[in-house]
Amino acid sequence: LFRSLLVDEAHNLVERGREMYSARLVKEDFLAVKKIVKAMERHEKRPEVHYILRKFEKSLEAANRVLLAWKRECDEFEVISDAGMLEFALLRVAGDYELVAKEYPVLPERDTILSLYFDVRRFLAVLEKFDESDRIYLDYDEERKFRIKIQCMDPSGCLKEVMERVQSTIFFSATLLPIRYYKEQLGGEKEDA
């Protein structure tokens, strides 16, 4: 079966690729979810579910502590070499959330909790593929909220991995110049036309 990948507006793919293979977490999101979980704990009567909620709260606190330590050392912007202990804390957050979700098919403030869960999952997925083309940095957003971001600097490896799953890839764009730059950034090889 002949399979082709058609990419329109290919000049945008480099920047989109950087964003697709990047992820960020905001420290204050962990505190917001922790507050919700504490309120759930206060109202929970089932001891086994109370235990699960408490465990989830502790994993949120552990992730928050790692972020807080970095926040204290970061004035405006700092590049770090790895996510260190945060990765383990995030694995716990994700696993503990899944236990809570089994007990609460309808979560209070569901959107806030799910948003953090999906951000954590995305961060872990991007972190799993972390290589020399990525950077991890700490900074503050426009509202002065502290965040950690894995930034894909060169998406060519990830894009090439996708393109290797098909027989051919055709890029459409009126502005793929300079051609060598785009060829390199889009995962092209020397022999590619």
Question: Language-model features: where?
Answer:
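Conserved coupling segment at the C-terminus of the helicase ATP-binding
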Residues: 2-193
